[in-house]
Amino acid sequence: MPQLDKFTYFTQFFWSCLFLFTFYIAICNDGDGLLGISRILKLRNQLLSHRTNNIRSKDPNSLEDILRKGFSTGLSYMYSSLFEDSQWCKAVDLLGKRRKITLISCFGEISGSRGMERNIFYLISKSSYSTSSNPGWGITCRNDIMLIHVPHGQGSIGF
């Protein structure tokens, strides 16, 4: 970079400041510019804070109901998706047996039973609720609650 004298430096500084401040004012004074975005974000945060204050409940039974509904929805989704996958695998296996090739013998199965679900719900209901500075959603998870699905019975895949 060339060495500039003070006068040349000043003119470049002046024109760059004038150019940047002109665009800054044009952007910020526009209703859709930066100030408009900040107003929208402030309004959104206010609406979300009002909504979360109405939703929060200090009743541990309602939190337990939410957990139960969430787990039952997740389990039913898991059962239905694995059932559909198993049906697909059986259809592909039947098609392969007609052609005397084994494509997929089995996708996997759920080795747990409904008793396992009851045991999980029992452990969740026994879990302790925290009473810290965050009232409402302060639930501490127990370390001994863990649900792992490991598909087994995976057959050979041949192409």
Curated annotation (Swiss-Prot):
The family this protein is said to belong to: Belongs to the ATPase protein YMF19 family.
Enzyme superclass (EC): translocase
Assembly, per entry: F-type ATPases have 2 components, CF(1) - the catalytic core - and CF(0) - the membrane proton channel. CF(1) has five subunits: alpha(3), beta(3), gamma(1), delta(1), epsilon(1). CF(0) has three main subunits: a, b and c.
Record membrane topology: Single-pass membrane protein
Protein name: Putative ATP synthase protein YMF19
Primary site of residence: mitochondrion
An example Gene Ontology CC term for this record: mitochondrial membrane
UniProt KW Nucleotide-binding keyword: yes
GO biological process: ATP biosynthetic process; proton transmembrane transport
Coiled coil ranges: none
Location(s) in or outside the cell: Mitochondrion membrane
EC number, UniProt record: 7.1.2.2
Catalyzed reactions per annotation: ATP + H2O + 4 H(+)(in) = ADP + phosphate + 5 H(+)(out)
Function comment: This is one of the chains of the nonenzymatic component (CF(0) subunit) of the mitochondrial ATPase complex.
Species: Helianthus annuus (Common sunflower)
Pfam family, one: YMF19_C
Keywords assigned: ATP synthesis, ATP-binding, CF(0), Hydrogen ion transport, Ion transport, Membrane, Mitochondrion, Nucleotide-binding, Translocase, Transmembrane, Transmembrane helix, Transport
GO MF entries: ATP binding
